[in-house]
């Protein structure tokens, strides 16, 4: 996973709330056996509308999504995070996220930055007044820079640390490889094992 420190990208105003994971990527797009290639399914039901924000320039090149409250609610669907990232998003800004989506985002490298709803409304207005507005999100300082405005955002320390270090679940385990190997070497031979095939 790529470490996240600072990202600058075009802001995209998605004026919708209660966006569940099935709206982010409908189930019909979940048949792949790989972890990439899900961008075509992102907001597929809405993207058939030519006036949908991601069909409009310059928002079709955006990488900072600003959304209403309760984004990513519903079923656990890692594909929702993967679809956002495959499309090019690195940051999602909202006043409230679904808990499971929030966890999946941090594990995959997508920053879910939580701000006050007034700040979401303010960002929407800024972006709509100046389409193509670049927003800079600094994870180390936990702030969002848009035009001349600096807004703080919330993220738990553990998720911030993982993002800053670029640590997915596998990388976390590999950091403990010496301890894992020491444990395995001391494990009694009569206990069951899962060994690689040769």
Swiss-Prot record:
Q: Which GO terms describe its cellular component?
A: 3-isopropylmalate dehydratase complex
> One Pfam family, short name please?
Aconitase_C
Q: Any keyword Cell inner membrane?
A: no
Q: Name one GO molecular function term.
A: 3-isopropylmalate dehydratase activity
Is the keyword Amino-acid biosynthesis in the record?
Answer: yes
Q: Which reaction does it catalyse?
A: (2R,3S)-3-isopropylmalate = (2S)-2-isopropylmalate
Q: In which pathway does it act?
A: Amino-acid biosynthesis; L-leucine biosynthesis; L-leucine from 3-methyl-2-oxobutanoate: step 2/4
Record GO biological process: L-leucine biosynthetic process
Q: What is its EC number?
A: 4.2.1.33
The cross-references to InterPro entries, in alphabetical order and at most eight, read: 3-IsopropMal_deHydase_ssu, Aconitase/3IPM_dehydase_swvl, AconitaseA/IPMdHydase_ssu_swvl, IPMI_Swivel, LeuD
Instruction: Give the UniProt keywords, A-Z.
Output: Amino-acid biosynthesis, Branched-chain amino acid biosynthesis, Leucine biosynthesis, Lyase
* Family assignment from sequence similarity: Belongs to the LeuD family. LeuD type 1 subfamily.
Q: Which NCBIfam families match?
A: leuD, PRK01641.1
The job of this chain, per UniProt, is described as: Catalyzes the isomerization between 2-isopropylmalate and 3-isopropylmalate, via the formation of 2-isopropylmaleate.
PANTHER family reported for this sequence: 3-ISOPROPYLMALATE DEHYDRATASE SMALL SUBUNIT, 3-ISOPROPYLMALATE DEHYDRATASE SMALL SUBUNIT 2-RELATED-RELATED
Assembly and binders: Heterodimer of LeuC and LeuD.
- Designated name of the protein: 3-isopropylmalate dehydratase small subunit
> Source species, please?
Mycobacterium leprae (strain TN)
Give the lineage: Bacteria, Bacillati, Actinomycetota, Actinomycetes, Mycobacteriales
